[in-house]
Amino acid sequence: MTTFNTKKLPSARDAIAPDGSDVRLLLTLAGGGLAHFELPAGETSIAVAHRTVEEIWYFLDGQGEMWRKLGDHEETVPVEPGVSLTIPLGTHFQFRSTGKKPLQAIGVTMPPWPGEGEAFEVKGNWPPTVRRSS
């Protein structure tokens, strides 16, 4: 039986994502998980793709751009508070923070994040500037 869960956004990051952004873990159910992502102002993530998960992101703060490529379809879109977007399975993606504040988003991962090896590096649209996770 599923129980109710409630969690406040942690003040410190839980991990560095494979794309180099800071991750604060929120809640998970059988069908998906929720996390908060933050990329410092002026930084560019590492381009990655996922092996088994799809994501939906909603941007909370900052300004930036998200590049996505799936097969022959490729686009770069501006992101800011109020913008949501999808990252279908197998999509190559990369994002950068172009404003004076960190770029912040919450993302739903479906199914829940399985762990190490889920994301793999791909050729991106911009040179990354963030540190790689260890």
Predicted regions, residues:
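A short, N-terminal "cap"/entry segment at the start of jelly-roll beta-barrel domains
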Residues: M1-H36, I46-A47, G117-S134
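A short, compositionally biased micro-patch
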Residues: L29, P40-G42, T52, F59, ...
